[in-house]
């Protein structure tokens, strides 16, 4: 069993992508760093390129062992869903290009893991992230969701290990 594992949680978005790095060592979860990427560019393709560059910089700087990425949820607007899917593809590509395995989680699974219900509000998720990590949640909502994805994944790893499946 590894002495510690570092996970980057990512909440993809075409306007704002939240990310959070959480390390588990001896069963203790620690916030390493977190932030939000607001890609810039003259058009959508340029913004996707900027998202890739900025996220690749984060991955290089923190060298996570694994990535927990929030899956695309059903959007009411088809065009919005397509853009979100493209942003998510960029996120997966940035992780894969740096050898970081990507594990997908539905938003409802992440919420249930942190709050106990898959229909929790972002504020509730952010509050619980702060409680789990022992910090005051002063980050953007997308960043809180990304940290929640990382925590959800670390908890899944621990449960799998305890069940003797890993």
Swiss-Prot record:
Entry-linked NCBIfam families: ruvC
Residues the entry annotates as binding Mg(2+) 2: 70
Annotated binding of Mg(2+) 1, by residue: 11, 142
Cysteine disulfide links: none
Entry function: The RuvA-RuvB-RuvC complex processes Holliday junction (HJ) DNA during genetic recombination and DNA repair. Endonuclease that resolves HJ intermediates. Cleaves cruciform DNA by making single-stranded nicks across the HJ at symmetrical positions within the homologous arms, yielding a 5'-phosphate and a 3'-hydroxyl group; requires a central core of homology in the junction. The consensus cleavage sequence is 5'-(A/T)TT(C/G)-3'. Cleavage occurs on the 3'-side of the TT dinucleotide at the point of strand exchange.
Family: Belongs to the RuvC family.
Recorded name of the encoding gene: ruvC
Domain of life where this protein originates: Bacteria
GO cellular component: a single term: Holliday junction resolvase complex
Name of the protein in its database record: Crossover junction endodeoxyribonuclease RuvC
Cofactor binding notes: Binds 2 Mg(2+) ion per subunit.
EC annotation from Swiss-Prot or TrEMBL: 3.1.21.10
Record key words, sorted: Cytoplasm, DNA damage, DNA recombination, DNA repair, DNA-binding, Endonuclease, Hydrolase, Magnesium, Metal-binding, Nuclease
Localization of this protein: Cytoplasm
InterPro entries documented for this protein: RNaseH-like_sf (IPR012337), RNaseH_sf (IPR036397), X-over_junc_endoDNase_RuvC (IPR002176)
Keyword hit for DNA damage: yes
Catalytic activity from the UniProt record: Endonucleolytic cleavage at a junction such as a reciprocal single-stranded crossover between two homologous DNA duplexes (Holliday junction)
GO terms for biological process, alphabetical: DNA recombination; DNA repair
Keyword Metal-binding: yes
Residues the record marks as active site: 11, 70, 142
Cofactor or coenzyme needed: Mg(2+)
Alphabetized Gene3D superfamilies for the sequence: Ribonuclease H-like superfamily/Ribonuclease H (3.30.420.10)
């Amino acid at each position: 069993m590894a002495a510690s594992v570092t996970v980057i949680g990512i909440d993809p978005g075409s306007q704002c992508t939240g990310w959070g790095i959480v390390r588990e060592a001896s069963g203790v979860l620690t916030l390493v760093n977190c932030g939000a990427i607001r890609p810039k560019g003259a058009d959508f393709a340029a913004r996707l390129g900027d998202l890739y560059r900025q996220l690749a910089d984060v991955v290089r700087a923190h060298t996570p062992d694994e990535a927990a990425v929030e899956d695309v949820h059903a959007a009411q607007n088809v065009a919005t869903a397509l853009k979100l899917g493209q942003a998510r593809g960029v996120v997966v590509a940035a992780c894969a290009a740096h050898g970081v395995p990507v594990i997908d989680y539905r938003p409802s699974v992440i919420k249930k893991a942190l709050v106990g219900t898959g229909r929790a509000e972002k504020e509730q998720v952010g509050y619980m992230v702060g409680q789990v990590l022992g910090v005051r949640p002063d980050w953007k909502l997308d960043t809180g969701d990304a940290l929640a994805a990382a925590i959800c994944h670390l908890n899944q790893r621990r449960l799998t290990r305890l069940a003797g499946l890993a």
